[in-house]
């Protein structure tokens, strides 16, 4: 099951983790991440996976009505970058959405992800996103956990600071230890070939 995941690069796994952060505002669940990783390895494009994410009830519940485009852009920024858009950024993305371009609300999220990592983007935005990806990967890949409520809690604890990153990793470790306990127990799904440093390039 999910044999293709072990063939993916660290960069590809990071790209998938970013989708969970941006579309669901949580860490990935291991089962879902490994499923989509297998689909990616078998040739499904990241764009197609992103479209599938956008159609999920979890995304719809998070972003609400798309009639409020400024609110939509603001929520994407908060999930991906941990901040509100500045006036120039808001104006740019609204023009893109409303100006007849090929960018749709579904692909706008990917565009903002790409912008955060671009050389022209801010270093603070790139670092914030990279740390959320690290936290999400630790939860789902290193620890192999799939409880969605725990995935939400771990990500919500992150505020951009180094302390909150360490706290989130410690929280994942505590959840893992509880899941491994004979007294409490829990579902763990770790795959051979996807190691402790899943985003090494």
Model-found features: residue ranges?
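Substrate/cofactor-recognition hotspot
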Residues: 1-201
């Amino acid at each position: 099951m999910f044999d293709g995941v072990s063939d993916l690069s660290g960069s590809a796994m990071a790209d998938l983790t970013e989708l969970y952060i941006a579309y669901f505002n949580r860490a990935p669940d291991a089962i879902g991440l490994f499923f989509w990783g297998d689909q990616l390895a078998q040739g499904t494009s990241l764009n197609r996976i992103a479209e599938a994410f956008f159609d999920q009830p979890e995304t719809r519940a998070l972003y609400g009505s798309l009639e409020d485009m400024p609110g939509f852009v603001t929520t994407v920024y908060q999930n991906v970058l941990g901040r509100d858009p500045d006036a120039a950024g808001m104006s740019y993305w609204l023009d893109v959405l409303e100006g007849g371009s090929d960018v749709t609300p579904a692909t706008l999220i990917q565009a903002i992800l790409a912008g955060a990592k671009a050389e022209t983007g801010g270093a603070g935005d790139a670092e914030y996103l990279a740390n959320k990806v690290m936290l999400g990967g630790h939860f789902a890949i290193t620890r192999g956990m799939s409880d969605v409520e725990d995935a939400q809690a771990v990500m919500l604890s992150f505020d951009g600071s180094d302390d909150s990153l360490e706290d989130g990793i410690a929280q994942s470790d505590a959840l893992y230890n509880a899941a491994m306990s004979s007294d409490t127990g829990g579902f763990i799904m770790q795959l051979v070939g996807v190691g402790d440093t899943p985003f090494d390039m």
